[in-house]
């Protein structure tokens, strides 16, 4: 009910860089955002600081890190009985985050325009059409290094998550991760980014054009008796 960010807070879902997708409920969170913003965060793995998190509703309050311990002690000592009392205590310590750290301040409009499409191919084309916008150029460069398969399943995931409960989205993630371990780029992504750290993953397929709809849809198939039970 209360998510407090500080100037040290960083939010990112960078899983497409290792052949995965926004997991641990991340797809659900991104699916509730405006479509262009959610897709941008899922595909690019952009890093957001406190100002943007509060603006998007991913955080409910901002408290400077030097006040966090005081806030914690006040919450413990006052033993608030309901959310309203919790909010009142947090508001005592809250302040405004630094807008200068915002990525969305100058780029929200173009992000929504470029990333609101329902296919990765259309998003790539939209990036090209937006050039020479420097911000979009950086996002496009990031996209070209991600797993093509991960890009496609991540976009399908967050579009579907928009109309799902958290429970159903987690079941979907469970299906996806089983397939990532069996037929995806996950092991190669971990090797390239975390083990050998050569940052040169050999994605298979290596282009978005080679990742057809049948391959994408296979990641979302029911596991029948092996499906996650929640």
PLM features per residue range, with description:
Residues 4-109:
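Conserved catalytic cores of soluble enzyme domains
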Residues 65-230:
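Intrinsically disordered, low-complexity segments enriched in small/flexible residues
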């Amino acid at each position: 009910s209360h998510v407090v960010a500080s100037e040290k807070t960083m939010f990112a879902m960078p899983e497409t860089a290792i052949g995965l997708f926004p997991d641990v409920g991340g797809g659900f969170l991104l699916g509730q955002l405006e479509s262009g913003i959610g897709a941008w965060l899922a595909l690019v793995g952009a890093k957001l600081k406190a100002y943007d998190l509060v603006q998007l509703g991913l955080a409910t309050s901002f408290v400077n890190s030097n006040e966090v311990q005081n806030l914690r002690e006040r919450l413990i000592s006052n033993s608030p009985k309901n959310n309203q009392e919790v909010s009142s205590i947090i508001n005592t310590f809250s302040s405004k985050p630094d807008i200068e750290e915002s990525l969305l301040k100058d780029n929200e409009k173009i992000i929504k325009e470029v990333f609101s499409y329902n296919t990765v191919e259309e998003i790539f084309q939209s990036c090209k059409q937006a050039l020479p916008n420097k911000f979009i150029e950086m996002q496009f460069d990031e996209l070209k290094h991600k797993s093509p398969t991960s890009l496609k399943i991540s976009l399908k995931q967050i579009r579907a998550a928009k109309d799902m409960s958290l429970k159903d989205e987690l079941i979907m993630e469970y299906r996806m991760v089983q397939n990532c371990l069996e037929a995806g780029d996950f092991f190669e992504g971990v090797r390239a980014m975390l083990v050998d750290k050569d940052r040169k993953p050999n994605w298979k397929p290596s282009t978005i054009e080679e990742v057809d709809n049948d391959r994408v849809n296979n990641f979302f198939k029911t596991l029948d008796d092996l499906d996650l039970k929640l």
